[in-house]
Design a protein with these regions (language model features):
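Long, highly charged, low-complexity intrinsically disordered interaction regions
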Residues: 4-6, 10-100
Length: 100
């Protein structure tokens, strides 16, 4: 498992980011919350990660805090909630707002 990645942002959209580290570009799917909390293209960033492997894809998910990452893991443990739904939930509110 990859716990976190630290590198330079080379591409960024509201739900996806590319981080370059040691000449390799890593694509990470992110929530809108994470997108708002990190820098812009050219900035250094540290994202906590979850690697999900399925029959169709290998996807790396990135989070601006380990707290958000752990909450994502909690969400996807709920039956019927997959990674995409969990990211949408995290995009709508902060972890603190969801808990309250």
């Amino acid at each position: 498992m990859i716990y976190y990645i630290k590198g330079k942002i080379v591409e960024k959209s509201p739900t996806r980011i590319v981080i370059e580290k040691e000449g390799i570009g890593y694509i990470l799917d992110i929530s809108l919350l994470t997108s708002e909390n990190i820098g812009n293209v050219g900035d250094e960033v540290k994202l906590y990660t979850i690697l999900k492997i399925s029959d169709e894809d290998i996807i790396l998910y990135g989070f601006s805090s380990s707290y958000e990452r752990d909450f994502f893991l909690l969400l996807i443990s709920v039956p019927g909630v997959g990674p995409r739904i969990a990211l949408r939930i995290l995009s709508g509110s902060s972890v603190e707002e969801i808990y309250n």
